[in-house]
Amino acid sequence: MSGLEHGDASSPVPESDAELAFEGALRPRSLSEFVGQVKVRGQLELLLTAAAMQNRSPDHILLAGPPGLGKTTLAMIVAEESRRPLRLTSGPAIQHAGDLAAVLSALVPGEILFVDEIHRMARSAEEMLYLAMEDYRIDIMVGKGAGATSIPLELSPFTLVGATTRSGMLPSPLRDRFGFTAHLEFYETHELEQVIERAARMLHLEIEHEAVAEIAGRCRGTPRIANRLLRRVRDYALVHGTEAGLESVRAALDLYDVDPLGLDRLDRAVMRGILTRFGGGPVGLNTLAVSVGEEAETIESVVEPFLVRIGLVTRTPRGRVATPAAWEHFGLEAPAAPGAPARASGPASVAGALFGDEL
């Protein structure tokens, strides 16, 4: 019998509807339901409670941190807990000041405006946002050249919630206009176990504690990845007719190229570049990106923070350098001279398996 609590696999189950409902159900609806980020939750609770007691809109909020830690969920919780409508957009969708003006002019009093990837807005839109955040008005330019005139447009009071993975890319005048900045951190293992157990209950999936711990150890400290891996484990248990035990979890995650440290195919490609192509480094970000065939921004914002966090890579003024732990994990011997070719230190199958036999 499978760990899944439903009938025969051939039964007509509306999987698409169930999956859509699952996506929405996974998001916590209140700060009390939100797992992890204890300090940020306490700060937000104080901010929202004070605003409610004074019958005013909450201050503008900036949520900063790596992808998948709950920035969008927290924005939705801010709207839910303050009982205000929520409008969602993203920085890449605002490439002209006119795009932002259209969004701002449509806001109703007290509305929460969530801008994901706010650091990717056009500079002209950022400059328009300064006045909107401070005085709830914008200036619309009409005409061109010497005959151009500025027409002020009053806006309804609103709260801006911005999310960014690159807070350093925001200009100081914009950062300074946020009343509160929350810095989200990677999750601890025990917090991830709570996230996985909650999601498993919603999936009606019976899963052993050892299996939960295994997923928590491979999900890069990120709830979004934890939930994604859990769904793959669910699929594996369903297809193979097994319980969601430790062996099933390991088999499923190995099938999807997630190693015991949580490294995926892109992580290993980056490490392969540093270790085998550049002798452990140092190597610059752009050079590394070209060798891997990936965008430099993706490596810097998605891959590198995790590799640095688990101690496989260090950043130096000259570039990225592999640590002794990286050489050990991949079964390679560090070269005597920086930049020299790497050699396998153990059985050839170890390094070959980790690197896809591309040594």
UniProtKB/Swiss-Prot annotation:
User: SMART domains of this UniProt entry?
Assistant: AAA (SM00382)
Q: Which residues cross the membrane?
A: none
One example of the protein's molecular function in GO is:
four-way junction DNA binding
Q: Which domain of life is it from?
A: Bacteria
Coiled coil location: none
* Chain sites annotated for binding Mg(2+): 72
Sorted alphabetically, the Gene Ontology BP terms of this entry are: DNA recombination; DNA repair
Residues binding ATP are 26-27, 68, 71-73, 134-136, 177, 187, 224
Provide the reaction this enzyme catalyses: ATP + H2O = ADP + phosphate + H(+)
Q: Which region ranges are annotated with the description Head domain (RuvB-H)?
A: 260-359
Q: What are the subcellular locations of this protein?
A: Cytoplasm
Q: Region entry Large ATPase domain (RuvB-L): which residue ranges?
A: 1-187
| Record's keyword terms, sorted | ATP-binding, Cytoplasm, DNA damage, DNA recombination, DNA repair, DNA-binding, Hydrolase, Nucleotide-binding
Q: Enzyme class, one word?
A: hydrolase
| EC number, as in UniProt | 3.6.4.-
Supply the domain comment. Answer: Has 3 domains, the large (RuvB-L) and small ATPase (RuvB-S) domains and the C-terminal head (RuvB-H) domain. The head domain binds DNA, while the ATPase domains jointly bind ATP, ADP or are empty depending on the state of the subunit in the translocation cycle. During a single DNA translocation step the structure of each domain remains the same, but their relative positions change.
Stated family: Belongs to the RuvB family.
Q: How does it assemble?
A: Homohexamer. Forms an RuvA(8)-RuvB(12)-Holliday junction (HJ) complex. HJ DNA is sandwiched between 2 RuvA tetramers; dsDNA enters through RuvA and exits via RuvB. An RuvB hexamer assembles on each DNA strand where it exits the tetramer. Each RuvB hexamer is contacted by two RuvA subunits (via domain III) on 2 adjacent RuvB subunits; this complex drives branch migration. In the full resolvosome a probable DNA-RuvA(4)-RuvB(12)-RuvC(2) complex forms which resolves the HJ.
Q: What is this protein called?
A: Holliday junction branch migration complex subunit RuvB
